[in-house]
C-alpha cells in the first residue's frame, strides 16, 4: 500500500513538472519584443543623455581600477575604447536593442 502511494505521488509530481515546462516555454514565446520599434527624436535624446552619463561613470570606475593598480593601464584603455565603440554602435542603431534570434532556454549566462 505504501509503495502504491509513493508511485502515485511521484506520477503527480512528474505530471506537474512536465506541464509547468510547457507553460514556461509558451510564456517565453509571448514575451518576444516587437520587430520594428523606432524612437522619436526626443526619446533618442533622453536615452542618449542617460547612456552618456552611464558611459562616463563606467569610464570613471575603470580609471579608478587603473589608479589603484587593479588593472594595467593598457587594459583600462582597451576597456574604455570598447565602451566608446559600444556607445557609438548603440547611437547608430537609434538606441533600440537588437533582437537576438537564438533563444536562451534554461541556460545560465554567468
Curated annotation (Swiss-Prot):
InterPro entries: DUF2680. It comes from the Bacteria. Keywords: Signal. Residues 1-23 form the signal peptide. This is Uncharacterized protein YckD. The lineage of its organism: Bacteria, Bacillati, Bacillota, Bacilli, Bacillales.
